[in-house]
Amino acid sequence: MERARPEPQPQQRPLRPAPPLLPVEGTTFWAAAVEPPPSPPTLSAAASATLASSCGEAVASGLPPAVRRLLQVKPEQVLLLPQPQARDEEAAASPAQARLLQFRPDLRLLPPPSASEGAPSRPELHPVQPRALHFKAKKQELGPGLDPSVGPRGGVETGPRASRVVKLEGPGPALAYFRGNEKGKLEAEEVMRDAMKGGDGKSPAAIREGVIKTEEPERLLEDCRLDAEPASNGLVHGSAEVILAPTSGAFGPHQQDLRIPLTLHTVPPGARIQFQGAPPSELIRLTKVPLTPVPIKMQSLLEPSVKIETKDVPLTVLPSDAGIPDTPFSKDRNGHVKRPMNAFMVWARIHRPALAKANPAANNAEISVQLGLEWNKLSEEQKKPYYDEAQKIKEKHREEFPGWVYQPRPGKRKRFPLSVSNVFSGTTQNIISTNPTTVYPYRSPTYSVVIPSLQNPITHPVGETSPAIQLPTPAVQRPSPVTLFQPSVSSAAQVAVQDPSLPLYPALPPQRFAGPSQTDTHQLHSEGTHTVKQPTPVSLESTNRISNSASTAHARFATSTIQPPKEYSSVSPCPRSAPIPQASPIPHPHVYQPPPLGHPATLFGTPPRFSFHHPYFLPGPHYFPSSTCPYSRPPFGYGNFPSSMPECLGYYEDRYQKHEAIFSALNRDYSFRDYSSERTHSENSRSCENMNGTSFYNSHSHSGEEYLNPVPQLDIGALENVFTAPTSTPSSIQQVNVTDSDEEEEEKVLRDL
């Protein structure tokens, strides 16, 4: 629609002289479709109009042969031919009745010649057949060559959805026919007359900025299935409605498919068509209706549900005028000392009785809420006497309870769940082990941690099997990489020995010692080294079975006497994820493990439940399961955590030399009990640094035999608060049966293993 208008011709000339026109009543006109050729689209390019029937040769057979020829016409001309009324009639349409109508490029509706006026340039459209047309009014944007001051420019376009070219098309050739209304009320001659007046450079003002597009319904034009009867009389059964469809240029992009029904009535020759529908866009007035804001009342959470009257209640009674006697600071039934009252509590204590008396229907909670609201309404000057009174109460409380520190009651607050289950109970040492879902999946430790039980003066190594870990008693004799400790999260981990034929010896050497001053150690004597394939199954039935006896300090540790080999093979500690290489034999592997630390939450302020005993350990990384405390990250013993992990420095000499160890945990220093013997270092001492900061000093003497010395007796009073923790309920029932037997029975068991 953007192409420029051609130079309009002043008068339309027919191809031949017009003969006497036939009456147009009962005549249907055919319009030949004209399309520009696919050659360069110039305004003077010729178009070929082919006259044919929409239903084959049914209609074209009544036309003279001269009609069915190609006419060279201009792109803006359309050939109109009258349709023969019947096949048997003699009066056929002559080619002289064909008219080429001159029209502007933006006017698309082409009527047949008018019979009333006789002028070939003033066409009319008489509805004679029961047909209805689709009229679509499309807004047309003004091009650069159109002048908006002249008036709204529009056009009439015919054809089913043809907006580019002038086309009245059907399913067959490029022919279409106009149908009228059987009632004779559809009159559009003024539209055509104004359309043909476009030759003088003026466009019809009745067509406001739109394009009338005549469309036939979906089944207006039948294909060749129609027989000769509907083709001869021009009747096509179908209904149509007149639709006004403005485009997006008029009412916005969302109104493009809006269709408004439009009724066309018969108008006199001097009248103009008026669109009865939505007015143009410039006439639309949108009034902004102000939205009345609805006040939303946010109900405060502190407001009581019942209206409490405070008009006649005095809320500024001074503490000196209240007459409330000083109540002593009482303790509850558990001995808990109450906190001193603050300023609000002092004020509420004075005014609560009066407010409750004024509102007998309110409960205690509603009175408390209202007291809080009224307290917030007071100024600082009004609150000052109550702050002074609260300070006096606080000082008096400090005098009565000098060392009192406020501690919230444990039952009123949700604490962190302690999922720590103690493996051993009674006089045995606690091992921190969590539930199987929270165990840190530590991969392939080198050696295992072996902790004995000291229930009786004569006890035996106790191996523990928990849902997460298993602590075996044997240790590796040869330096080949063998994994003896492998925790599992899903099920109980088994002892994984890569080489079952490895000769193993008990990790706990058979030694006895009477006390801290006893230095005489029994030598190991046995027939030979026994091969131990799995640990001795020992279990503990319950925590109540073994009582907390104070005989640990006088306990005597004894095991079966087995002669160890003359040379020991030791493996230097390596990173936990690295394989263990073959290491050179170290003659004197006097290695010990620092005492396992209890749960960090129970380091201070917890009465000891179990007595301290002497642990034994093997070299290599150690396992510290995770816990809920923030400073005990899994594994607990790894990483450089200042003041959160124990730093044990042990100096272990020969059996007649002094044993000394320095322990530091959570910035508290503890030391082992000093001995009277003087500490001396051997010149062939070897040291290896572990990842968790534990240093081992392996020294040896010039003697041929080596002994694995026990940890000396420690200061129980200084260490029992650190290494002990209350036994929590384990995740599963753990039973360790401790069987007392003499040395012969134990030797027999070890020989069987």
Swiss-Prot record:
Residues 7-22 have a biased composition (Pro residues). One of its GO terms (molecular function) is DNA-binding transcription activator activity, RNA polymerase II-specific. Residues 1-45, 140-161, 514-540, 726-753 are annotated as: Disordered. GO terms for cellular component: chromocenter; cytoplasm; nucleus. CDD domains: HMG-box_SoxH_SOX30. Residues 337-405 bind DNA. The keyword Acetylation does not apply. This is Transcription factor SOX-30. It comes from Macaca fascicularis.
